[in-house]
Amino acid sequence: MAILVEVSLWVLITITTIVSWQGFRNPAYFDKYLFEVEKITIDKQYYRLLSAGFLHTSWLHLIFNMVALYIFSVGVGHILGIVNFFTVYLGSMLIGNLLALYIHRRHEDYSAVGASGAVSGVIFSSICFMPQAEISFYFIPYTIPAWAFGLFFVLVSIYGIKKQADNIGHEAHLGGALAGIVISIFLSPHILKLNYFPILLMSVPAITFLLLIAYYPSMLLLPNHWYLTTKTAKETLKTNYDDLDDETALNELLEKVSAVGYYNLSKQEKKKLEELAKKIES
């Protein structure tokens, strides 16, 4: 069983790395599979709810998620078995992205990538089974109980969703974490009896918050500083690239990618960038 868990985990990490690398080198591929509200709700491209979990914005983003996945997955894999482990992983990825879709359903330009929701689910599954395990950080000379880390994680995610002051996918984190708890209880009901207090301590704030935003959506109608900043940057850097020669247009587009990120380009800009890339390749 131990060898099977290790092999399966490394296969998952390898697939995620290959898909992410393909996204790094091919903007069209990245754009085709990332999580984008408009593509999912209007164009019905539901596969993006899962495919986005295998893409990342950078090598650092990828490495951070895969290291966290490896650290917490071995224990969960041994306890639940391979099939149930992947149920937690993919289920958390899907539910995390569904929560992000619900919260950002009015933001058609919102997009995201990353395995963070799935990894959060695995982390919280691990905490459900081993709430008293000690978690340490390289930059802090102390350890904290896993359940305390889980509670802190939930509260930070709730604050991040409410504040909307950065480009971190707090919605996917919270949705994935809660999914990891629920799926683990479904697969192993006895853990609720054994570890009911830490599980409730992590779950109640998350469930309460989700119920509040379901019944009072106006709670989320605060200025989205990241969205406004990105929108302003887009408008400021807007250029008619058809009026420029290819070299100048390419330089302008690459400069904009550096400033606001590829997934914040308009559809026309992405199309123009792909056209210029094909010209260079030919």
Spell out what each predicted region is:
Residues 229-282:
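C-terminal regulatory/interaction regions
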Residues 1-244:
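A detector for small-residue-rich transmembrane helices and their helix-helix packing motifs
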